[in-house]
Each structure stands twice: as structure tokens, then as C-alpha cells.
Amino acid sequence: MSTTTTTLHTTTGTVYVADGTTDGKIGYYNHTDDSTNVIRKPIPIQVEDARTLSKSPTTKEEGYQLVDFHTKLPEGHFLDSKSPENKKVIEQVYFDECRRLVQEVTGAAEAYPYVYRVRNQEQNAKASNKSNFHTDFVPVVHVDRDDITAPQRLRASLGAEKAEMLLSKYKSYGSINVWRPVKNVVQKWPLMLVDHKSIENWDYSTHMFTLHSSNDERVATRGAKDHETILTHDKRYRYIYASDMTPDEAWLFFAFHSDPALGIPHGAFWDDSTKEEALTRCSIEVRIWVFFD
């Protein structure tokens, strides 16, 4: 990872946030026909390059951190991640690499990797404007879980008995993402993190929008989820990314934390400086339950 003290570098781009509903009712999304009443609002943003910040963010203070990370697995395992053989290797070898990294960086007393996602984002900004909330390349800013849906997923991941034991044993917990490019330097759709430290008492209930889903086939693999949690706009947000991320770097960030101050809304964003010939962005993220004394 390269971090300098040079002049702050920024770029501009666009993300989408939730801006209420068309009918004033609870937000919904139907997976069967892609129907929704949610108003998706494009927001032009100025994004700060983490490499040129005067102070490097940390998971303990800001909820996110850019780190060096070298896996011993060849990239082929990630590029063909759905094959049973590669899936097994990722869940055994890569999960353990991520677990050790996360515990070393965050100081978590216990850590349990529970799922991974490999994404290929190749479309352009115009295509993203026509897409639904759940395609890989839609830059909708969100958190993976909130204070309602996190316990649901924790119980589904670890079993109700173990989940309750861990919740009673530790003072705080979270779901941390280890997000890393695969194969190429990121040239398109970099990951953007929202820093809300300047907003006192920021909370999931005050600055996030709940989107209720129906007919979601993913329930079979990830467990029940009461709703998705999408960001609403606030002019006080700071937007952070890392320029030219390589496969030997990773973002660590809390996609949920029991202390909302450390929960980080995130999403891909369209960088206005993206070149026409930019390569498809391939990335892998591993989600890990972490517990703190």
C-alpha cells in the first residue's frame, strides 16, 4: 500500500442514494419483476484519494482502512470462483488468510468468515442508470446489515446458540469486509466509502433507508433478511476511495458495526476520469463476523 503526504488528490463521480418513494409508502423491491416504488437519486460527488490524506484512516477510529494483503492463492481460483473445487479452496485457505489479517489489524478477539462474493463490473455509467438495485454494477450506496438484520444473519451464519453466546460475551461486534481487486489494477468502478464522522449521532435509523424485498431467491443461501439498507443523502458526508488499487491491497471496512459510528456505507462509483478502454473490474470480498472485548 502506498500512502503519501502530498497534496490531497480528488476525483469526481456519481453514486445513487434513496430519496423516498413514489407513493409515500414503505419502500419495496420485487425480485420477480424488478418493480419498486423507491426513488433512486443520482448524487454527484467529489471523492478523496485515501493515499493522499493527511492522516490514514483506521478501522478502530474511522471504521475503514487500506492495507497491504498478499494471498498465496493463484488468481485462477477467484476468476472461476463458482466451481466446487475453487469454492472449497477459497473457503478454506483464503478465508483463513482474511481472518488472520482482520484480527491482526482490528484486534478482534474472535473472527468468523461466513461468505464471499466475486464481482465483475464492466458496464458504463449510462448502463448503470437503467439497472435494478441488485445487479453488480449499480452504484447504490448501502450497508450490508443494520441493527435489525445483522442479528438475523449472525444466527443464520453461526447458529442461534453460538450467536447468542457471542453476543452476550462481547461488548461489541460487527461484520467487516475484506475487499480486494483480482487480476488487474482497478481502472473502472472503484469502491467508494462514506465517512460520516462529522455527523454527531449518525445512526442507521436516521441516515439509512429501508427497502423491503419480496420473492428473493437468495434467502436460500444467505438466510432471511428483513430489508436492504440504503443511504440517504447528507451534504456533510466525505467520500473516500483509493486510486489504482492493486491485487496486493485490500480495503477493510465495517459493513455493519454495533456502534453505528463505525458502520460504513459503501458502493462502487463511476469515476468521471475513467478511460474508454478501462478494463473490467474484478474483485472479491469476504465478510467476517468480528467480536471485541
From Swiss-Prot:
Transmembrane segments: none annotated. It comes from the Eukaryota. One of its GO terms (molecular function) is oxidoreductase activity. The keyword Oxidoreductase applies. Its EC number is 1.-.-.-. Keywords: Oxidoreductase. The keyword Transferase does not apply. Disulfide bonds: none annotated. Pathway: Secondary metabolite biosynthesis. It is an enzyme of class 1 (oxidoreductase). Signal peptide: none annotated. This is Oxidoreductase clz16. It comes from Cochliobolus lunatus (Filamentous fungus).
